[in-house]
């Protein structure tokens, strides 16, 4: 019996040593591959860290489309940038390009400049196929769950855009409420475009009851015929390893949670995290505490301002608790940081649509690009470090100056509602 116990303990020790010997990027790839995530190795990735850069680059790409333009957004806010986009899409449709667009019913209804029936009818009259995903009809309020929160654009099957931005003027000009609106998007060329196209077409066919498929939509390995875009100037351009994690309710429920939790658990040196709605769950809180405890430098950036009520109270409550466990917390001051990124050990990162709240972790349709690439991660690390210059470092003293006793109580109360935020 003692022999058996000794063998079991030895085997466990070997497993632990092997896990710690494995680099964090290798570990996360292995874990995601077990969840059927496919990584391709021939990608270019260009970060687009502002609305101006995203829309300028994307409009240039759409203007050169030859075959198809597919768009999937939580919402198209009916303002000037959406009007400019739709004018461009009308032009492409008149040239014979297939233009398809999806938007979420709740995302549309919950913004203050929604697309109305007359707008949709006009777009269809100009050759744009546009459909609303799961419209909300009274009294079926249960439909506020399982929303499509993705942000995907695929052009000619070989250029894709994804990240945290919808289509709205405030990505360019900010808002009176919060000021500057910061966010992150990226452009991908290479094999990782095909999974994004598959995600779009699967939902498109479900919503429209069409059967759109075939090789013309999957041209990720063919040379890009779109020119004049912002180049990938890194040493790894065309050789980046990228996987797409797709949260689809009832099919891949836990993929976002698994990625973030295991990325944090795998970290050996550093974690830098920006997320606007950091309500977290128990596993993520525990992972962050444990990372700090084992000597990983954990840095989190959240906005001092927010676009919605209650959720930020929970966020501030969480980061204060984490601060007391050794996590470095920064409160971004100039505006609202809507960015959703994590960078680990300077080796890998993610850019995508997923927040770290109950909706993204447990309910909504989401997708993120996981980028296993040091130069791209370094670019995001540099952005984080630059933004620290515009932020307040959280300490017991700055916490007391930042939050009144009433606000602290409100945060405690809000954290009780975490499963619903």
Show where each model-derived region lies.
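Charged, low-complexity intrinsically disordered terminal segments
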Residues: 6, 19-421
């Amino acid at each position: 019996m003692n022999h058996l116990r000794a063998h079991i303990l030895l085997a466990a020790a070997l497993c632990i040593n092997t896990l710690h010997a494995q680099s964090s990027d290798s570990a996360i790839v292995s874990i995601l591959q077990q969840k059927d995530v496919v990584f391709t190795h021939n990608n270019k990735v260009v970060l687009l860290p502002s609305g101006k850069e995203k829309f300028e680059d994307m409009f240039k790409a759409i203007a050169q489309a030859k075959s198809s333009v597919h768009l999937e957004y939580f919402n198209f806010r009916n303002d000037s940038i959406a009007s400019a986009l739709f004018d461009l899409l009308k032009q492409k449709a008149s040239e014979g390009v297939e233009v398809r667009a999806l938007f979420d019913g709740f995302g549309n209804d919950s913004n203050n400049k929604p697309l109305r029936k007359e707008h949709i009818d006009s777009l269809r009259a100009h050759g744009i196929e546009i459909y609303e995903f799961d419209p909300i009809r009274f009294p079926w309020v249960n439909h506020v769950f399982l929303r499509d929160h993705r942000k995907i654009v695929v052009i000619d099957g070989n250029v894709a855009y994804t990240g945290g931005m919808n289509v709205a003027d405030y990505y360019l000009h900010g808002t009176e409420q919060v000021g500057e609106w910061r966010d992150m998007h990226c452009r991908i060329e290479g094999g990782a475009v095909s999974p994004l196209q598959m995600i779009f077409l699967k939902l498109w066919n479900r919503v429209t009851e069409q059967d759109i498929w075939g090789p013309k939509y999957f041209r990720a390995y063919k040379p890009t015929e779109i020119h004049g875009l912002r180049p990938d100037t890194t040493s790894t351009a065309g050789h980046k390893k990228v996987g797409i994690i797709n949260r689809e309710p009832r099919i891949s429920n836990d993929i976002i949670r698994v990625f973030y939790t295991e990325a944090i658990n795998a970290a050996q040196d550093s974690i830098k995290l920006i997320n606007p709605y950091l309500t977290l769950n128990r596993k993520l809180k525990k992972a962050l505490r444990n990372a700090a405890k084992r000597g990983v430098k954990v840095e989190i950036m959240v906005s001092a301002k927010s676009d919605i009520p209650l959720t930020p109270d929970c966020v501030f409550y969480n980061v204060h608790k984490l601060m007391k466990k050794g996590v470095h917390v920064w409160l971004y001051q100039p505006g609202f940081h809507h960015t959703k990124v994590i960078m680990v050990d300077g080796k890998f990162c993610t850019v995508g649509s997923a927040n770290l709240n109950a909706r993204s972790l447990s309910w909504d349709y989401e997708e993120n690009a996981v980028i296993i690439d040091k130069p791209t991660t370094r670019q995001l690390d540099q952005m984080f470090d630059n933004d620290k210059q515009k932020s307040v470092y959280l300490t017991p003293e700055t916490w007391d100056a930042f939050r009144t006793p009433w606000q602290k109580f409100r945060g405690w109360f809000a954290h009780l509602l975490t499963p619903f935020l």
